[in-house]
């Protein structure tokens, strides 16, 4: 039986412990349901996290939603890293996943690891997401 996590107001404050991969694993083991929503900037991240959203995805859909491109294929790597850092600054205790854009991991393992590392260091992401065939 699944149940929803209970995020009380106290748990959503800036003083709360950061959401970690260990938390996500525990919630999964317990069958808990938790929200994961997309944010593209610090303000939206702050609102979502204070509303009880523990996991935030910085999606490559920002190419369409923020930059006005016709598809996600146009998401620049540096832009994605920059907005990932903005989301983490807005919600420092949320678990933030940066979405690696098209061609940022397709040309080889070395480049994929380097770009993922940039998301973790420059973008301060807790995890990276990529799409596999």
Predicted regions and their residues:
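Short glycine/proline-enriched, acidic/aromatic patches that form the donor-sugar handling elements
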Residues: 63
């Amino acid at each position: 039986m699944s149940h929803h996590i209970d995020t009380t107001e106290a748990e959503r404050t800036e003083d709360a412990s950061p959401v970690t991969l260990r938390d996500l694993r525990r919630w999964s083991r317990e069958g808990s349901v938790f929200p994961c929503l997309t944010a593209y900037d610090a303000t939206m991240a702050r609102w979502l996290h204070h509303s009880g959203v523990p996991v935030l995805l910085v999606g490559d859909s920002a190419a369409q939603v923020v930059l006005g491109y016709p598809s996600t294929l146009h998401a620049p790597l540096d832009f994605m890293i920059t907005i990932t850092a903005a989301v983490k600054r807005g919600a420092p205790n949320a678990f933030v996943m940066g979405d690696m854009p098209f061609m940022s991991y397709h040309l080889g393992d070395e480049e994929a690891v380097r770009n993922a590392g940039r998301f973790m260091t420059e973008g301060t992401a807790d995890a990276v997401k990529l799409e596999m065939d």
